[in-house]
Amino acid sequence: ANFLGLSPSAKEALKSKNYIIYEHDHKYLKNRDPARFSNFVAPAHELVNVEFYQKARKILCQSGFHANIVKRNLNLDNIESVGGNLWTEEALQMLEQLASREKKDSCAVMDSPISHKNTPTAVRYCEATNREYALCSGNNYHAFLEQLGANNTLVFFPQTPETLSRIVVESRMMGMKVITNKLVGATQESWFKLKGIDLIEKMREKREEIPELIIGLMS
């Protein structure tokens, strides 16, 4: 659950218990955006929830890139990268089907209203390099992946650090190339060289590894 929804008394009570933080969007920062600071390190007055992070049995991050940013800000030794994320078996089977489909020689661009997803820069890149592109959007997960996977390349230039980036991993699982910047955690994982079925199998392994890690920490 999102611990920001907890009351102060509930958070205080948890500090004496055995709990894990599955870190996602830099909740130790007031603005949640480490990109605003040099080397992603915020000044002390920009940190929040520090004691809650300190008292955790473990802070699980989604990539080594993500874990390093958290470590540089909090200087804690209870931080660990799980090196991936979780997809349902149903989603992985769907990605398997989409990986086998023929793809157009064009770029997929996520058409997002969220400013830090930086859709305009991806569009400008495609236009400047004379690449065909398709804007992909929608709330239906399957339909969105079908739009995405119809192309052979994802173009994505986020403005803030992506702890992993599900869209990048999903694109690789569908056998696509990825054009991005240095703000995507997934691209710095050793398994990122994999794509298609090989990467899908790696994420299947994560479905076993991550829960086993959590159970081990809580036992």
Residue ranges and their predicted role:
Residues 1-11, 18-22, 155-156:
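Short N-terminal targeting/anchoring amphipathic segment
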Residues 5, 27, 65-67, 185:
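Alpha-helix capping/helix-boundary segments
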Residues 11-17, 50-55, 101, 170:
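Short, conserved loop/helix-junction motifs that constitute active-site signature segments
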Residues 14-43:
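Active-site proximal beta-strand in glycosyltransferases
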Residues 37-59, 68, 149:
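Membrane-proximal helix-turn-helix segments that form the acceptor-binding/catalytic region
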Residues 54-78, 118:
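A short, active-site helix/loop in glycosyltransferases that binds the activated sugar's phosphate group
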Residues 86-144:
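Conserved catalytic-core segment of nucleotide-activated headgroup transferases in glycan assembly
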Residues 149-219:
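Catalytic binding pocket for nucleotide-activated donors in carbohydrate/polymer assembly enzymes
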